[in-house]
């Protein structure tokens, strides 16, 4: 067996000097960055992408509003319906509901009968009532009356 080991070593050995004694492979990355910098850049990219996905429509609306402010609205947007007020605080919402229903009923009457205005004025709105109904205060039942005597 010692002869076989000597033959295997002899195959890899050569009397000439090695060709690539000081060979260094080229770097795989064109930009040398530490790993933590690369991870920080990727994390920042993910955060920006998620933030844009969340508020992208808001940014788009803001850009359209700025363009409308700077250049004026498009000609086809002149007849567009106006937006509602952002807050209805202090408004009687039940009264507004009644007015809307009466206006809608008036449009149906005007469309069907051909009249311009309804024949009778709308009834006055009912007085406001609380939307929560409370029961009468509890009274002593007959069971307690029997127990007291």
Curated annotation (Swiss-Prot):
<protein>
    <recommendedName>
        <fullName>Small integral membrane protein 44</fullName>
    </recommendedName>
</protein>
<dbReference type="GO" id="GO:0016020">
    <property type="term" value="C:membrane"/>
</dbReference>
<feature type="transmembrane region" description="Helical">
    <location>
        <begin position="36"/>
        <end position="56"/>
    </location>
</feature>
<keyword id="KW-1133">Transmembrane helix</keyword>
<keyword id="KW-0472">Membrane</keyword>
<keyword id="KW-0812">Transmembrane</keyword>
<feature type="region of interest" description="Disordered">
    <location>
        <begin position="104"/>
        <end position="149"/>
    </location>
</feature>
């Amino acid at each position: 067996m010692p002869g076989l080991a000597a033959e295997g070593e002899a195959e890899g050995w050569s009397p000439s000097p090695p060709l690539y004694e000081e060979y260094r492979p080229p770097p795989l990355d064109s930009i040398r960055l530490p790993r933590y910098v690369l991870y920080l850049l990727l994390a920042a990219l993910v955060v920006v992408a998620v933030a844009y996905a969340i508020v992208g429509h808001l940014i788009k609306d803001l850009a359209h509003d700025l363009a409308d402010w700077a250049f004026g609205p498009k000609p086809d947007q002149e007849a567009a319906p106006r937006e509602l007020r952002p807050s209805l605080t202090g408004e009687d919402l039940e009264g507004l509901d009644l007015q809307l229903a009466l206006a809608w009923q008036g449009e149906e009457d005007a469309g069907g009968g051909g009249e311009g205005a309804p024949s009778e004025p709308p009834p006055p709105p009912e007085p406001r009532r609380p939307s929560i109904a409370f029961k009468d205060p509890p009274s002593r039942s007959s069971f307690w009356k029997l127990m007291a005597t």
